[in-house]
A protein has these predicted regions:
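Hydrophobic beta-strand residues in large extracellular and virion-surface proteins
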Residues: 21, 25, 108, 120-122, ...
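Mitochondrial intermembrane space
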Residues: 11, 29, 38, 58-59, ...
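Non-cytosolic coordination micro-motifs
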Residues: 112-114, 123-148
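Broad gene-expression machinery/nucleic-acid interaction feature
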Residues: 61, 117, 132
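Long, charged/polar, surface-exposed segments that mediate recognition or autoinhibition
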Residues: 53-105
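N-terminal leader/targeting segments
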Residues: 1-55
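Ser/Thr-rich, low-complexity intrinsically disordered terminal regions
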Residues: 34-49, 94-118
């Protein structure tokens, strides 16, 4: 595994894991097979300089998105795959956020001990939602390779 304390390595790792998970979903959920997901590579934000003058960076807006109608059965498959896949990665703390499930909005979160996150959000079709699935990532602040 790469040294994930380095910003560039962590960004590459999380994008690779999100891509790998998207491919798994495409093979497990029929309606996601052969779909063209939209990728956003996000943007880098720079934190305030520390006492040595070095600045940590974080990555926000890593995202795969797809407007597609899914079923509750699909959501169950996705949750199982999400839990199974991400517990074997650096973001092993898995949480299901069930506050909005009564309005057909499902959210699963994988988080690391230092604040990295990968989130899967699913909106099922109804009067409040545009049906879609989104995988988004956040890389917590780290120093660039050149700062070591």
């Amino acid at each position: 595994m790469d040294n994930l304390d380095i910003f560039e390595n962590a960004c590459k790792y999380f994008l690779e894991k999100m891509t790998e998970f998207k491919e798994i979903l495409s093979s497990k959920v029929n309606s996601l097979n052969n779909q063209d997901w939209i990728l956003s590579k996000g943007s880098t934000k720079t934190c305030k300089a520390d006492e040595t003058g070095k600045k940590k960076r974080c990555k926000v807006g890593l995202n795969y998105g797809l407007k597609i109608e899914l079923s509750v059965a699909d959501v169950d498959i996705i949750l199982n795959e999400f839990s199974s896949f991400f517990t074997k990665t650096y973001v092993e703390n898995i949480e299901r956020i069930s506050n909005n499930e009564e309005i057909a909005r499902y959210e699963f979160l994988a988080r690391s001990s230092i604040g990295d996150e990968i989130r899967c959000t699913i909106y099922l079709a109804n009067e409040w939602n545009i049906p879609q699935i989104s995988l988004s990532g956040f890389v917590a602040p780290r120093y660039k390779k050149s700062d070591y």
